[in-house]
């Protein structure tokens, strides 16, 4: 017998934490706006927004939020731009560790941190030409919470 599990995007009753970087705030605020609108569209009413200085500081806050067991998912939003950050590789590498925290705590941790070469690319991914990656991250969080509940 083959069984296929497929989750929907109904977020009613879910509680999410959004951790957003203040660095490159003109980008991250657009990502946050997209995420909050997406949550609203999917029926999520309970969202906690946590602001951190930058993407480098996210793993510590993600770990604390995951360990608290208060949330169904954690969404990380940020923008690391190669041209604007001399230590791009270090910051991008540290922020990429976020996913392992989710596995460790059995909670969906969604990586919505843009890593781009230019400011223009980041702007495109924050709500112009390439959609809004914050909105996509929020929808992914809702779906993953529902999927894990099916397992």
From Swiss-Prot:
Belongs to the DMRL synthase family. Pathway: Cofactor biosynthesis; riboflavin biosynthesis; riboflavin from 2-hydroxy-3-oxobutyl phosphate and 5-amino-6-(D-ribitylamino)uracil: step 1/2. PANTHER family: 6,7-DIMETHYL-8-RIBITYLLUMAZINE SYNTHASE (PTHR21058:SF0), 6,7-DIMETHYL-8-RIBITYLLUMAZINE SYNTHASE DMRL SYNTHASE LUMAZINE SYNTHASE (PTHR21058). The keyword Ribosomal protein does not apply. 5-amino-6-(D-ribitylamino)uracil binds at residues 23, 55-57, 79-81, 111. It catalyses: (2S)-2-hydroxy-3-oxobutyl phosphate + 5-amino-6-(D-ribitylamino)uracil = 6,7-dimethyl-8-(1-D-ribityl)lumazine + phosphate + 2 H2O + H(+). It comes from Leptospira interrogans serogroup Icterohaemorrhagiae serovar Lai (strain 56601). Gene3D superfamilies: Lumazine/riboflavin synthase (3.40.50.960). (2S)-2-hydroxy-3-oxobutyl phosphate binds at residues 84-85, 125. NCBIfam families: lumazine-synth, PRK00061.1-4. One of its GO terms (molecular function) is 6,7-dimethyl-8-ribityllumazine synthase activity. The keyword Transferase applies. Catalyzes the formation of 6,7-dimethyl-8-ribityllumazine by condensation of 5-amino-6-(D-ribitylamino)uracil with 3,4-dihydroxy-2-butanone 4-phosphate. This is the penultimate step in the biosynthesis of riboflavin. The gene is ribH. This is 6,7-dimethyl-8-ribityllumazine synthase.
């Amino acid at each position: 017998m083959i069984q296929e599990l497929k989750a929907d995007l109904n977020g009613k009753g879910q509680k999410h934490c959004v951790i957003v970087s203040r660095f490159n705030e003109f980008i991250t605020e657009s990502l946050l706006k997209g995420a909050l609108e997406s949550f609203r569209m999917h029926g999520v009413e309970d969202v906690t927004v946590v602001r951190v200085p930058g993407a480098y500081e996210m793993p510590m806050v993600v770990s604390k939020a995951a360990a608290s067991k208060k949330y169904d998912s954690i969404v990380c939003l940020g923008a690391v731009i190669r041209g604007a950050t001399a230590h791009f590789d270090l910051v991008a590498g540290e922020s990429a560790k976020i996913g392992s925290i989710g596995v460790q705590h059995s909670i969906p941790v969604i990586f919505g941190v843009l890593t781009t070469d230019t400011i223009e690319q980041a702007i495109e991914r924050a709500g112009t030409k390439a959609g809004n990656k914050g909105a996509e991250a929020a929808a992914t969080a809702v779906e993953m919470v529902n999927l894990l509940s099916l397992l």
